[in-house]
Regions:
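Phosphate-binding chemistry for phosphorylated carbohydrates and sugar-nucleotides
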Residues: 2-6, 46, 52-58, 77, ...
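Conserved active-site alpha-helix within GNAT-family acetyltransferase domains
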Residues: 551, 563-569, 573-595
Length: 596
């Protein structure tokens, strides 16, 4: 992050100048551990920037180009804020430097320590003071709550309010390492664990913010565990309150993702409020929310808000409790407390509005997540078609399952839900088996021969037909297969890890290994603990040379080293041209000292 901070400043300044609009840069990594950091870019309306502007900024930051466009446009105006991470002030200074590289006269408002919603709020309405606005809301609340602030900026804000109904914990903003550590909304949702501070009072409602205070979840103690009131429960309570206040619910909607439990969806529909499912991600929820008079949307992690695109007389008190452009954990908390207070609903009654169906969510690694494409709302696969057909076969009217590609790595997420836990578990096993059989190992064809890509495994020692794996290595260098027994081989495999691994190519139906490549990743102190990839021991069975398997092995290794800032290999002179064709180039000289 440090390495690209200047360029981020320059890129946002360019966009601000080009559009003649103010922009915001929030330095935060939200719910992540203290050693991570990142930025969120905000437009002049306090909204998240559109995808096209996000792409423009990313392309400039990731390019080698350090030049900037014509400066004969408007003067950039940038608002900057950051949360409590140790690296934030340094990143802020570098971003300011980058802004001034574009134009030294740029207008820069450094707000320093703020929450993400606070910076959005500032851009939405410069005349309103966020803390004063929160104080006015507090005057309307007397419902007690204990709030875990994740040792983040939320504690810094709440401690300024000092109201009797509000008890705070985990407010240590000085010890950077405590940020989000065994506390905060993500910890509560993911681990279903009690935060480190937990007050033993069974009869009190508890809440947890995350590090930059843009999300909130609620819970109460139940023996040694907690009953979680997540984003769906938050949406349900708000929808219930609105349904009692408004006669015509036609233009009111609850926006959710496929991960919302069907019991929740059915509860909302019974209230007379429509539900709309979008793709995962707050940007997708927010985009749909703009289409209705009132839209309620919360992800299960507690990130969300209520958008009042049209004011309703009976809801004017409620409207002021929700952030107008983005999820705000503190305002959302106050809004929920206001509803509980107005309706006299207990936390137990809130929790029992509906009961979730049994469900299971799992993540599986696949060889190429780009093989998986979904409908717009992600509830069905459009590719691979046979996988969706299989899902339709194993699910009945009481069960559902959807699959979607996830994140930057080659993973897919599988969600299964049903009325019966045994049925859910059975479908989970079927999904795991299907994915393992079809998508974990890459399959490809060369010269009408079918191959798979795999990791070297202990059972590969058992292949006895010539050439075995050890015989294959003897085509590369000196090795005596007779001197390596099963125990030695197994110990070697046990010592392989994510930074030292061997990829092999096999015939699909015989499992004979016909190609192998070794990858090592070395973590450096330089380049912010950057990694260097080393490619070693590339070999293809001599009977299959000329099939393109060597190029395939190198491509596999390069893909595995995507998190490395450079990749190094050494080779014999006769192989130099081959590796040049694979994208490698001369870089210095490689010397070696072999022990006799």
């Amino acid at each position: 992050m440090i390495d690209i901070s200047e360029k981020i400043g320059t890129a946002v300044a360019m966009v601000s100048s080009y559009h003649n609009n103010k922009y915001g840069i929030m330095i935060t990594a939200s719910h992540n551990p203290h050693y991570y950091n990142g930025v969120k870019i905000i437009d002049s309306n306090g909204e998240m920037i559109p995808e096209i502007e996000e792409k423009t900024i990313e392309e400039f930051v990731n390019s080698k180009n350090s030049c900037v466009e014509d400066k004969n446009m408007s003067l950039p105006e940038i608002y900057i804020g950051y949360d409590t991470r140790e690296s934030s002030p340094e990143i802020c200074n570098l971003i300011i430097k980058g802004i001034k590289i574009y134009n030294k006269d740029s207008i820069i408002h450094n707000l320093k320590l703020v929450s993400t919603p606070e910076l959005h709020f500032k851009l939405f309405n410069e005349d309103l003071i966020y803390i004063e606005y929160l104080k006015n809301l507090c005057e309307k609340i007397n419902y007690p709550v204990v709030c875990d602030c994740a040792n983040g900026v939320g504690g810094y804000i709440l401690n300024k309010l000092n109201y009797n109904f509000l008890q705070t914990s985990n407010t240590n903003c000085i010890n950077y390492e405590s940020l989000n550590f065994k506390s905060g909304s993500d910890y509560v949702v993911t681990e279903r664990e009690i935060p480190t501070y937990f007050n033993n009072n069974h009869n009190k409602l508890h809440a947890s913010l995350d590090g930059d205070a843009d999300r909130i979840v609620f819970y109460y103690k139940n023996n040694d565990s907690i009953n979680l009131l997540n984003g769906d429960k938050i949406s349900a309570l708000i929808a219930y309150y609105i349904s009692k206040k408004v006669e015509n619910l036609e233009n009111i909607a609850v926006i959710h993702t496929g991960y919302s439990n069907n019991s929740f969806v059915n509860f909302i529909n019974k209230l007379g409020i429509k539900t709309i499912c979008t793709a995962t991600g707050v940007k997708n929820l927010h985009s749909e929310a703009l289409n209705h008079d009132i839209s309620i949307y919360f992800e299960s992690n507690g990130h969300g808000t209520v958008l009042f695109n049209k004011s309703y007389e009976n809801l004017k008190d409620l409207e002021q409790f929700f952030h107008p452009t983005i999820g705000d954990g503190i305002m959302d908390m106050f809004g929920i407390l206001f509803i509980l207070q107005e309706t006299s609903i207990t936390m137990y009654e809130w929790d029992n509005m509906y009961t979730d169906n049994p469900y299971h969510l799992l993540k599986m690694k696949v060889f190429d997540k780009s093989c998986f494409e979904t409908t717009k709302n992600e509830l069905r696969l459009t590719k691979p078609e046979d996988f969706q057909q299989y899902i339709d076969t194993v699910c009945d009217e009481k069960t559902r399952c959807f699959v979607r590609p996830s994140g930057t790595e080659d993973n897919i997420r599988i969600y299964v839900e049903g009325n019966d836990i045994n049925a859910v578990n059975n479908i989970v096993m079927l999904m795991e088996s299907w994915v393992s059989s079809n998508y974990i190992k890459e399959t490809f064809t060369k010269n009408d021969k079918l191959f798979i890509v795999d990791d070297l495994k202990k059972e590969d020692y058992d292949y006895k037909l010539y050439p075995s794996y050890l015989d294959l290595l003897s085509q590369l260098t000196i090795i005596n297969p007779k001197n390596i027994n099963r125990e030695d081989f197994n110990n070697f495999i046990d010592n392989l890890n994510q930074n030292h691994f061997i990829k092999v190519i096999k015939y699909k139906y015989t499992n004979q290994i016909v190609g192998s490549i070794t990858v090592l990743k070395e973590t450096k102190l330089i380049h912010d603990f950057g990694k260097v990839g080393h490619i070693e021991d590339v070999v293809v069975d001599k009977a299959l040379r000329g099939y393109g398997l060597g190029k395939k092995l190198v491509d596999i290794a390069v893909k595995e080293c995507q998190d490395c800032y450079k990749i190094i290999l050494d080779c014999n002179d006769e192989n130099v041209e081959f590796y040049k064709k694979c994208g490698f180039e001369w870089k210095g000289n490689q010397l070696a000292l072999y022990k006799k």
